[in-house]
């Protein structure tokens, strides 16, 4: 355990950031899963609507540094390819 005051604060702030990042990643997984389920069901309109939300959330997560920008781009590209193949 840290003894220095500033380090104690860093431990607290790091834990808050960790909790926030876990929540954002969990939400991302949910939106991506909804998009994949819509693709699997064959409903192109629902898939495109879900993809619009998922793409926006991926960009937000990349902007906040939760995931890398390339990872967001790769995931969006993969989902877009699947939707276009419908």
From Swiss-Prot:
Transmembrane segments: none annotated. The keyword Transmembrane does not apply. Keywords: Ribonucleoprotein, Ribosomal protein, RNA-binding, rRNA-binding. Residues 1-20 are annotated as: Disordered. GO terms for molecular function: small ribosomal subunit rRNA binding; structural constituent of ribosome. GO terms for biological process: translation. GO terms for cellular component: cytosol; small ribosomal subunit. InterPro entries: Ribosomal_bS20, Ribosomal_bS20_sf. Residues 1-11 have a biased composition (Basic residues). Pfam families: Ribosomal_S20p. Belongs to the bacterial ribosomal protein bS20 family. Binds directly to 16S ribosomal RNA. NCBIfam families: S20. This is Small ribosomal subunit protein bS20. It comes from Bifidobacterium animalis subsp. lactis (strain AD011). The lineage of its organism: Bacteria, Bacillati, Actinomycetota, Actinomycetes, Bifidobacteriales.
């Amino acid at each position: 355990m840290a003894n220095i005051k500033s380090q104690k604060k860093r431990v607290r702030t790091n834990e808050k950031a960790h909790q926030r990042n876990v929540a954002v990643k969990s939400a991302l997984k949910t939106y991506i899963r909804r998009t994949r389920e819509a693709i699997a069901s064959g409903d192109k309109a629902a898939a495109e609507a879900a993809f619009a939300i998922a793409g926006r959330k991926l960009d937000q997560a990349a902007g906040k540094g939760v995931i890398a920008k390339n990872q967001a781009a790769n995931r969006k590209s993969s989902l877009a390819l699947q939707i276009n193949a419908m």
